[in-house]
Amino acid sequence: GTVKLSADGLPASIVANYDQANQLDRSISNEVLAKPVAFVVETSKGTEKLKPSKIEFLKQTPATLEWKVLLKGSDVEAECLAKMLFDGTINYQLKVTALRDVQVKDIRTVFDYTHYASKYIMGLGVKGGARPDSTIDWKWDTIKQQDRIWLGNVNAGMQVVFKDSNYKRPLVNIYYEFGRIRYPHS
């Protein structure tokens, strides 16, 4: 597969090259994202226009690639740090700093999947199976370990895990009750 980055350091395109038998075939090109991933900061003045700096590649090894982008707006700035692993996992840290007193209404990351890559769903309260046409009604619940969602099909998909600075990986199986997730600070 291939990941292409937008100027802000977030994925603009994720392409899977697998056939129906789950065999790699470079002649097949199936897009996972319908639109580039968007990081949005909404203030009382409206949506902040974040202008990205040039992508700075910090480190590259045979197994990882790390980069950084600074996003500057009129009232806030954000730092996007990313590390891509050999298996396609990308860990992002998005840190937002107010440049002056500002009322923030919402901070969100928007992932628009293609129909191809959103046949099945699991997480955020959905037990797994075909993706419903309705909106998912979800709220943080530390008992239910609902901090992630996966959308995809047999050949492609994407899992998004929500973390903050106090994130602690949940325990599984018989230890489930002893390792509940923590509410995020924000």
Positions of predicted regions on the chain:
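Beta-strand/loop-rich accessory regions of lumenal/periplasmic or secreted enzymes
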Residues: 2-186
